[in-house]
Amino acid sequence: MKPTHVLRLLALAPGMLVAPAAFAGLIVSAPVDVIGNLPLATFTSRGYGTRTYKDWGNEPYIAVNPLNTNDILISSFSFNTSSTTMGANVFYSTDAGSSWTSQFSVPTPVNGLTIPNDWTFAYTSAGTLHGTVLGGNNIFQGATTDPASLAAWSYTGGGTRINTAASSGNADQPWIALQGGRVFVAYDDFHFNTAERIAVSTNNGTSFTIDNPINNGPQAVNTVNPGTRIATDNAGNVYSIFGTGSATATRGVHNVTYYLNRSSDGGVTWDFNGSSVVGGIVIDSGVSTQLCNMPACTQASNNWFANVNDLRGNITSIATDKTGSHVYVLIGKQDANGTDRIYLAAYQPLGTNLVKSSEIVVSPAGERAALPAITVKDDGRVVVMYETYGADGNVHVHVASSDDFGASIGSDIDEYTFTPLTLAQATGSTTSNREFGDYDFLMSIGDTFYGTFAGLGNVNAGGIDTTRLIDPFFFSGTDAVPEPRSLSLVLTGLAAVLWLRRRKKNMSEVLCRSCATGAGRKRRRWRDGRSQRVIERPLDTTPATWC
């Protein structure tokens, strides 16, 4: 080999040292069937497997205690306060999600009022759990230091609604986010047209003294649910996403426009109300299949997701990194072929503005996608969850990631696949329209992310059979970063290359792999036999050429 060839190989050594980070994927735990991992006595006594209602995972939400990440709460539509002499049921784990308990620990805020109609939860940095609950079309906020205790729960104002008087009896879909001592609760107000608002407490939920629109006020014509979602950063900002729509000639199909807004003063004013007539930055617009109301779809005739889930909470999600230097939104719209897909748009601050840096499609072509969720880990990596339904008749729950600030998707794992029940099988009702609910949810603490979704149970052992139930599932994950390569290993590899090239010069095209990245790189996916973690990394299959 000529000396110039040796230098060329040695010049690659620095790149070989840093290459593993670029090839990192995700390590995701096998999903845990929450109902399937309850104590047998609880499963039996509560009738999880014998009741007509089997939709225990409908609209799941997750909160993890940052002071002890073994403590995990998952909520869903399981037992409400009218079906128990105690509180409404949440699922609680104290061993990082390996096993679960049913805790009837969320009391009604007002005697005689049934909850929940909707609810979302979040932990403070001090380990206090906050929750916002919809009951009687009003919004309530409460907190507890012990999610397993009914007596430990307390509500703002002793059970006083926190939504405005004008919206009383017409509020919907509360969404919670925390920031220091602030508690933000976004909600929809249907008392006059369609409005999106935010209620704010500046004293850890003791009182709510701010309640303002997150845009320029009610929209006179809106044929979709706004899907109002919020997220906060550590720089004092709160961000919102919502959608507005107008009907097309096809029922359940709308022209939808999505908006992003930001408040830098705790929800008092919103920075981009002047950016559009509605108020907020226009993220994008397109045709979207959701909310089949005019005329209403039925179980026998519909265009619902997977034929069992009308999307009545829009197709939206939002997250930001801690510093507010990157804001990410997920939206749903059709591609050029008429397939409903999930899109990821990334924004960065530029002066006082937010500027879109990229927008990409996340979900695969030819498969309808819905129920997106997103989080940003402390290392800046973006993690996305979404569901698809295709010609195979199965729902596929995907976990994808981006390590270049949303410019591309680096990995996409098919975390769970199942065949949905019919709605009548899941709910015992011939008029129900949602088997999975309005959302899935992702969150992260440090560089670990946690997620929940509704799916067909997969446990049939020890007297517990969940294979005919729709259950909440739990999973967690982190980065699959290969161990650092030492310089000695690199030099050993180079020596081997030199030796092989001397033995067989015509093998150079085999030994000198391509430097190509991006679309030419496929993924390798396997599940570790001991931990049952899904591991995925890129697999270079591009033609071998000299770099």
Locate predicted features.
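A short, hydrophobic C-terminal helix/tail in secreted or cell-surface proteins
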Residues: 483-501
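C-terminal PAP-associated
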Residues: 25-480
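Bacterial N-terminal signal peptides that target proteins for export
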Residues: 2-10, 486, 504
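C-terminal membrane-anchoring or membrane-association module
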Residues: 498-515
